[in-house]
């Protein structure tokens, strides 16, 4: 799939999230906001920090879209500092830890499209996807997937998640 995307002109950037067991731990709290994530390490090579900064500027000017491949890619991108200029000036890889838990209602700033699995209920990953498209929409998508016999979790089927603005532009 990544080869086909590249053949279609999609540029690939390397980002790394050292995913820990907390990503897969069930949410047991009544309120998603009360769930605590474990810290996970992030690393972005200096050259990719520059490319991400260029993509941020391009998107701000109305051009291009960012496709995150995998839910944890969204967590990684959304954990980055809003401005990457300081990291670029340092000229070194960007390395830090994050405990970001994306939940419905939180803005997703750096991703426009998401290619991901169908995640298990009460997981941090389904909460992340719901932050991307909204709780009502994710419930509808998952109900359709269950009706159609889609496979869930890491080795199951995948979906391309498009924000409402792309499906029904205003």
Show the residue positions of the predicted features.
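Surface-exposed, charge/polar-rich loops and edge strands
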Residues: 1-170
